[in-house]
Amino acid sequence: MAAAILRFEDSRVTGPASLRVSRLPAADKGGKWEICGICDGIEPAVFNRLKSLLDAGKREEAWEGCLQYVLDNTAAVRAWIGSDAHPGIEFFLRDHYFNSGSKNTGKILQRVLDKHHSGLTVDGIIGPMSKAFLHNSLSRGNDVAFLDDLREQRAAFYRSCKQFPTFGKGWLRRCDDAFSFARSLA
């Protein structure tokens, strides 16, 4: 999962040998530089540690550091789901979490859950009620339909962003790519 998320962040990176530092677009609010979505403006300590490893030629260690960071950064998704029984849904949510943050991921999930369990507050905080609704939805066993709903809400989220005119085409492509990968796991 983590390797796929890193590839979605930088399609030229396929593993340790191709791991690189890239300049962010001027309109990106993550800073000036990134390593597969790990930005100097958002995670400076992690970025600097990984860059130091790359500068020292420790590419394998830098790659492992990136993978572990993605897993640690998105671990809340596994806690929401409660098990590894729904890898496609877990992947899709982890990818969005890494790309857009916990609150935005919580909101798209809650919008999907509210569709089936009306009355859920959409605040981006996955608390006991959201988890109960999620577990109920997952117990129905239709992960592909749930993924369809998540994809729809993720695309709607991207379209609502102020920076959609600048980054929207790439965001929607990533959403589609993540959806395809998630379906292969479901």
Model-derived features with residue positions:
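Cell-wall polysaccharide-cleaving catalytic domain and substrate-binding groove, primarily
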Residues: 1-186
